[in-house]
Amino acid sequence: MGRVAGWVVTGVGVAVVLATLRDIVHTLWHPSGRGGLGRTVLAAVWRAGRPRQGHRRARVLAGPLAMVVVVVSWVSAIVLGWTLVYWPHLGEGFFISAELRQTSRGGFLDALYLSMVTMATLGFGDIVPTEEWLRIAVPVQALLGFALLTAAVTWVLQIYPALTRRRALAIRLSLLRRSNAVRVLSEEDVPMAANLLEDLAGELVQTRVDLTQYAETYYFRDGEESASLAASIETAVQLAHAAERSPRPDMRFAGRLLDTALADFAHLLDEQFLRVGGSTEAVLAAYTADHGHPVRGTG
């Protein structure tokens, strides 16, 4: 490989590493969590695991599997990038042990081996950098490998509290549905009803914030229908409509508050994931169907 071509390959490797780091930062620490590669991989795994008859377990595993695929994609991209950085310089920029030199080493596979070993912070010592900039580059990759491991653990720790809050809201809505809360609100005067609806609106706002911050939570399906917000969201719509028809001013206000929170949540779903472009009820019905639950209608 010529000197100019070698530096071009090195430049491509640096670009791959920087693009991957940008994606990691945007996925994990950007306020809206919008990493290009991560988001594409998540959506692809989600589409591959769309609900099919008899594949319930596969649907539940779609979210965790997608996260694993994203992390593997990040690791693979960084390893490939650093491989391209090292490859043109193996002949002159590294000391290769006598055992390896006897077998005419110094090709792409050796660069890949060096990149993988460095990424894993193992450092066997059979290929050692000698040029000054490479003596800096190799430890930098090792630091990136450790940082990526830490980031992957942080990612998991970030999203599971958001999933817990979403499931808690879903279970609360499921309990209200099983308690015939919609009928009670329509036919009886319940003193605590307005406060209940305001609390539901607040929890829905928190869920919307979580989905904005951790977009990957959308791709997590819940095994139990009672714990799935996609299956329970219609109850919130029915409660809001029932409250808006109440003769009590506080109930009508609470109903409008919940209805507005639902509209904002539906707008986020439609803008980021569904793109059906319909009413709030239509978007929420699409959300329910996308997670593999039957659409019963909001009444």
Per-segment meaning from a language model:
Residues 50-67, 126:
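Cytosolic juxtamembrane amphipathic/interface segments immediately preceding
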Residues 6-34, 66-74:
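Transmembrane alpha-helix/interfacial motif
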Residues 13-24, 74, 82, 100, ...:
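Pore domain of cation channels
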Residues 1-5, 18, 22-26, 78-99:
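Juxtamembrane "helix exit" motif at the C-terminal ends of alpha-helical transmembrane segments
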Residues 160-184:
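Membrane-proximal helical linkers
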Residues 60-83:
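Membrane helical hairpin/interfacial module
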Residues 28-56, 97-98, 168-173:
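Membrane-interface amphipathic/juxtamembrane segments adjacent to transmembrane helices
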Residues 177, 181-192, 196-299:
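Soluble C-terminal extramembrane regulatory/interaction domains of multi-pass membrane proteins
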